[in-house]
UniProtKB/Swiss-Prot annotation:
The gene is glgX. InterPro entries: GlgX_C, GlgX_Isoamylase_N_E_set, Glyco_hydro_13_cat_dom, Glyco_hydro_13_N, Glyco_hydro_b, Glycogen_debranch_bac, Glycogen_debranch_GlgX, Glycoside_hydrolase_SF. This is Glycogen debranching enzyme. The active site is at D336, E371. GO terms for molecular function: glycogen debranching enzyme activity; hydrolase activity, hydrolyzing O-glycosyl compounds. Belongs to the glycosyl hydrolase 13 family. The keyword Hydrolase applies. Pathway: Glycan degradation; glycogen degradation. It catalyses: Hydrolysis of (1->6)-alpha-D-glucosidic linkages to branches with degrees of polymerization of three or four glucose residues in limit dextrin. The record marks D443 as: Transition state stabilizer.
Length: 657
């Protein structure tokens, strides 16, 4: 039988060099590591990794070829109280595997034991890693590098975006290929999108609890192989990487960036009763934050928390991010529960992973977006990330909804959020684009549901409606649920228009949730993470063409307003913004705090947003000059020229002079 050569300790993972494959695995506490290779008949062949350089185990298998299936058995102590859970009876996934063969099904053999080890061998049913060869012709691909000030983000799910699209070929709907189809690209271009932000595409597993209920993890925030593409989104698992890169290349040719939502805060191994796939059996003590009793710190709400202050885990995370940029040409990342990235265990701006990203010539040049919180004490870190990062701005989301749907936000607070939340983000040299403004996201109500439901309706999730937030700041306008009288439909439409206008014409980087421009509803489910069905898939046949056109017109209007695209903080007297009352006069201190919800925002001295967020029709006296309403508030050929605007209740309009 072929013996392993010593090989090299870098790079991590399995790499084919034309003559054989080099295998490397980190484990600081292992006593022995076996490489397990499976032939075409499923027969297992085991080899001890002979090289041991520091904490890296390595070996070289001559004559091995791409397509080889493999895994690891890692020997070491079973000492749960000290955080060690080695169990060589269990076949483990290479954390750096580029492709996985097999499914992550709920099976007792995929558990290693809680207090005592489960020594039943699981190789027959455990997923296997696959050695891949990386040859791809990028042609003349180049990153669009859209300036932050011109960026419009569109958050979408690979499957949900295209699965029901009637103009995309049936055989590729819901796949990576569909993202690069001309129909999809033309739609994004016409809408005005500059960056497509995809929910997780790294391979993930459905939690055992969901599988037992007949559900699945739809969103993908349960990662199991961070270097491997999720095969369910590919026409063929073997060609997933090729399909994904084809889509990115096509999007780049259209000037559209691709941002990946990535989960570096926990793994699909969940809590100590969860399955054993990889990290727990390779080096539990190093990869996870471990409590003094040997259990996990659950700062993510998912059972475990990756220890991104450990040098080897920092190297792993950095290598993962570089892989997606260098191999797949992605343009940036949105980091889920990103406060975990800065834990040491307290949150620090100079945490090891932040420092590694800052010092990396590759990662420091791409777009970095943080979801700036986790669920641990001190986990809410909005505004506190290093200067390279932009951050989801939940202050904006809540303020916009409160102002237009709950009517309880003072003008001053609204204006502060409209001006890129400078009280939060104007520090350490950061620019307005650091505020990622959103009204909705995958997590929560859709925009239509914000105006149709007062309460969440998550019964389909199997948790008796306990899951999902109760703080939605929504308003059903008098009737729970979609549909209703013409008057009700019109009032809801006006609220949607007001929220979209606030989002797309405010300072900061706007993020639009896919489907909001259609009027997509999830029928009140504000936590649809386990709904891989028509509740979440965008129904293009039911899309509101009028709302889509309204959204596109707002985006194109935004691109014409210098105050919004120049990415400079507004200063008193700089000509970027003036705040006026209904009489076109500067607001008094009392009006800012206690005045009626009527406001005029003059941008770049030419564009005027007139707002009447009161219950009554109100005359708004426009500033001096000849003003005409502009699309999408008036037609191109018949602009409304006026000096006084009769502002409808809960209405707004944009003028130009």
């Amino acid at each position: 039988m072929t013996q392993l050569a010593i090989g090299k300790p870098a790079p991590l993972g399995a790499h084919y060099d034309g003559q054989g494959v080099n295998f490397t695995l980190f484990s600081a506490h292992a006593e022995r590591v076996e490489l397990c290779v499976f032939d075409a008949n499923g027969q297992e062949h085991r080899y001890d990794l002979p090289g041991h350089s520091g904490d890296i185990w390595h070996g070289y298998l001559p004559d091995a070829r791409p397509g080889l299936r493999y895994g690891y058995r890692v020997h070491g102590p079973w000492q749960p109280a000290e955080g060690h859970r080695f169990n060589p009876a269990k076949l483990l996934i290479d954390p750096c595997a580029r492709q996985i063969d097999g499914e992550f099904k709920d099976n007792p053999l995929l558990h290693a034991g809680h207090n005592e080890p489960d020594y039943r061998d699981n190789a027959a049913i455990a997923p296997k890693c696959v050695v891949v060869v990386d040859h791809y012709d990028w042609e003349d691909d180049a990153p669009p590098r859209t300036p932050w000030g011109s960026t419009i983000i569109y958050e979408a799910h690979v499957k949900g975006l295209t699965y029901l699209h009637p103009e995309i070929p049936v055989e590729i709907r819901g796949t990576y290929k569909a993202l690069g189809h001309p129909v999809m690209i033309n739609y994004l271009k016409q809408l005005g999108i500059t960056a497509l932000e995809l929910l997780p595409v790294a391979q993930f597993a459905s939690e055992p609890r969901l599988q037992r209920m007949g559900l699945s993890n739809y969103w993908g925030y349960n990662p199991v192989a961070m270097f491997a593409l999720h095969p369910a989104y590919a026409c063929s698992p073997e060609t997933a990487l090729h399909e994904f890169r084809d889509a990115i290349k096509a999007l780049h040719k259209a000037g559209i960036e691709v941002i990946l939502d990535i989960v570096l805060n926990h793994s699909a191994e969940l809590d100590l009763d969860g399955p054993l796939f990889s990290l727990r059996g390779i080096d539990n003590r190093s990869y996870y934050w471990i409590r003094e009793d040997g259990d996990y710190h659950n700062w993510t709400g998912c059972g475990n928390t990756l220890n991104l202050s450990h040098p080897a885990v920092v190297d792993y995370a950095s290598a993962c991010l570089r892989y997606w940029v260098e191999t797949c040409h992605v343009d940036g990342f949105r980091f889920d529960l990103a406060a975990v990235m800065g834990r040491t265990p307290e949150f620090r701006q100079d945490a090891p992973l932040f420092t590694a990203i800052q010092n990396c010539p590759v990662l420091s040049q791409v777009k970095l977006i943080a979801e700036p919180w986790d669920i641990a004490p001190g986990g809410y870190q909005v505004g506190n990330f290093p200067p390279l990062f932009a951050e989801w701005n939940d202050h904006f989301r809540d303020a916009a909804r409160r102002f237009w749907l709950h009517y309880d936000l003072p003008l001053g607070a609204f204006a502060g959020r409209f001006a890129a939340s400078s009280d939060v983000f104007k520090r350490n040299g950061r620019l307005p684009s650091a505020a990622i403004n959103l009204v909705t996201a995958h997590d929560g109500f859709t925009l239509r549901d914000c105006v149709c439901f007062n309460h969440k309706h998550n019964e389909a999730n199997g948790e008796e409606n306990r899951d999902g937030t109760n703080n939605n700041y929504s308003n059903n306008h008098g009737k729970e649920g979609v549909g209703g009288t013409l008057d009700l439909v019109e009032r809801r439409r006006d609220s949607i228009h007001a929220l979209l206008t606030t989002l797309l014409l405010s300072q900061g980087t706007p993020m639009l949730l896919a489907g909001d421009e259609h009027g997509h509803s999830q029928h009140g489910n504000n936590n649809a993470y386990c709904q891989d069905n028509q509740l979440t898939w965008l129904d293009w046949s039911q899309a509101s063409s009028g709302l889509t056109a309204f959204t596109a017109a707002l985006i194109h209007l935004r691109k014409r307003i210098p105050a919004l695209v120049e990415n400079r903080w507004w200063e008193e007297g700089d000509g970027n913004v003036r705040w006026l009352n209904r009489y076109a006069q500067p607001l008094s201190t009392d009006e800012w705090q206690n005045g009626p919800k009527q406001l005029q925002i003059l941008l770049s001295d030419r564009f005027l947003i007139a707002i009447n967020a009161t219950l009554e029709v109100t005359e708004i006296v426009l500033p001096a000059g000849e003003w005409h309403a502009i699309p999408p508030f008036a037609g191109e050929d018949n602009p409304v020229i006026t000096a006084v605007w009769q502002g409808p209740a809960h209405g707004l309009c944009v003028f130009q002079r």
